[in-house]
Regions:
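Extracellular jelly-roll beta-sandwich "head" domains, especially the C-terminal globular C1q domain
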Residues: 2-171
Length: 171
């Protein structure tokens, strides 16, 4: 059962009596919160070099959380779906400061080989360029998603840090 707002069943300000179903609803809400969906997040806090005009998969180095064995360090670029379903995948990437070119972040799934999220923007001249990208994708068990980046500064640049999370939304 999905979350139910208790205020829709009982409004203390109106003097309505608590319905008998309220106890069941609260119990189901607590079970929903306790049995959270499959989710994982990882980060990279060290520099990863990105060559000019080269699409590169980001490699994550630190697990932030993982309740379903979705991110595995032997494959540090991949977030794996443990069961079939719809998933939200989100990433945030910070490129080193440089005055020129574009910075791009793609979200790619292994089943189709295509991207389901993309964000491009011009570099900022005086500060690092940070990009957030997210998308919803249908995955089968053991499919995986990755974050890819590219930059066109004319030089080799680094990614200062990156974070990504995969969350199962439902079946």
């Amino acid at each position: 059962m999905a979350w139910t707002d208790p205020d829709t069943a009982h409004k203390p300000t109106t003097g309505n009596v608590i319905p008998t179903s309220w106890g069941t609803m609260v119990n189901q809400n607590l079970l929903h919160l306790r049995n959270s969906p499959e989710t994982a997040a990882a980060a990279r806090y060290t520099l990863q070099t990105i060559n000019n005009a080269t699409i590169t998969a980001l490699s994550f180095t630190t697990e932030l959380w993982d309740n379903a064995n979705m991110w595995r360090s032997p494959n540090p670029t991949r977030f794996r779906a443990p069961v079939d379903g719809r998933y939200l995948f989100a990433a945030s990437v910070s490129f080193q400061a440089h005055y020129g070119g574009l910075r791009t972040v793609w979200l790619r799934d292994s089943r189709s080989g295509g991207s389901f999220g993309i964000h491009r923007q011009d570099a900022t001249s005086s500060d690092s360029t940070s990009i957030c990208c997210s998308g919803i994708v249908g995955l089968l068990a053991d499919d995986y998603v990755e974050v890819y980046v590219a930059q066109t500064s004319g030089e080799t640049l680094g990614v200062n840090w990156a974070r990504a999370a995969l969350i199962r939304l439902g079946g």
